[in-house]
């Protein structure tokens, strides 16, 4: 099922066409499948920061300047997950890079100990690669899915 997204927040520049999310959520809390092609149109990754709200999924990227940013609304949604049975667990996200041609994705991104500055992925060897490193200008900015 394709889920249309609506733009919730933007800063600067021209507005690209509205993207579609190709995420297909399973009932299992932490599992998802996705199509790593055509996740976002090209304009989405140019000069701007956007937050898109979709049914069951949240997207955010930075503006490819190397600056870490997470929208407060998205942060609040994430922190709501750190309750109840999952209070001591790592929050997991799926993510994908434009082009799907990275050793880091598609895959799972983790939120470490409720610290909004500690998002990371693990490579095949188990090394933690933190999102602030992934978001340098020499990387394609990733697209994150909050798995609900």
Which functions belong to the PLM regions below?
Residues 20, 27-64:
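Short, solvent-exposed loop/hinge segments that bridge or flank secondary-structure elements
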């Amino acid at each position: 099922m394709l889920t249309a997204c609506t733009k919730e927040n933007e800063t600067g520049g021209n507005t690209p066409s509205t993207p579609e999310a190709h995420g297909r959520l399973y009932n299992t809390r932490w599992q998802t499948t996705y199509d790593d092609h055509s996740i976002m149109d090209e304009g989405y990754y140019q000069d701007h920061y956007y937050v898109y709200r979709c049914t069951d999924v949240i997207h955010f990227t930075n503006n490819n300047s190397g600056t870490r940013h997470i929208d407060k609304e998205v942060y609040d949604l994430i922190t709501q997950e750190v309750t109840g049975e999952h209070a001591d667990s790592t929050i997991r996200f799926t993510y994908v890079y434009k082009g799907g041609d990275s050793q880091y994705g598609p895959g799972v991104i983790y939120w470490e100990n409720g610290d909004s500055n500690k998002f990371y992925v693990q490579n095949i060897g188990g090394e933690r690669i933190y999102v602030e490193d992934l978001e340098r200008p020499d990387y394609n900015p990733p697209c994150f899915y909050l798995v609900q």
